Amino acid sequence: GGGKGLFWNTRVKDIKKGRKYRGQWTIPKNNKKEESVWEGLGIMEFPDGSRYEGMTKNSLFHGKGRMTHSNGDIYQGEWVEGKACGKGVFIDQQGSMYEGEWKNDAYHGKGTEQWNHNTIVYTGDFVDGQKTGKGKFEFDGNMYQGDFVDGKFHGRGKYYFAESGKIYEGDFRENNMDGKGR
């Protein structure tokens, strides 16, 4: 449990893990500093060069925050008990992007994923980081709209062929048209 207020500490090193935290802490009722926890606004620097800036609670990232990984990947959004959870945006160093809902550090719920400078776009449902449910996938002018399972066209769907202008509507199995369709 926390105390009656917060104090700001500018230089605190977590020797065990080599992390450095600057920010707000609780003041425990008994004034034993070793029982205080990060609570409020803070900055955490990791030994690999990664950096978190944002809200903390019970010594975990909690609330709105931004994690910049040492490789240049960035997540900005909501955190719950140390994990990306809620609404957020992830951008990797190649320019790929995901914007949408998160749960337990994974894409989960409704979202949009874009690759190759926006030339490939998926908009739809995600479950535990995988494209699963209903969605739309656009690439090279072609488009698939329908059911996805684990990132593949699987179930009922419609495929628009950009070059011929033809449309296949019917069943799909593991990214392939299955049956006659129409």
Segments from the language model and where they lie:
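Intrinsically disordered, low-complexity repeat tracts enriched in Gly/Pro/Ser/Thr and acidic residues
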Residues: 1-182
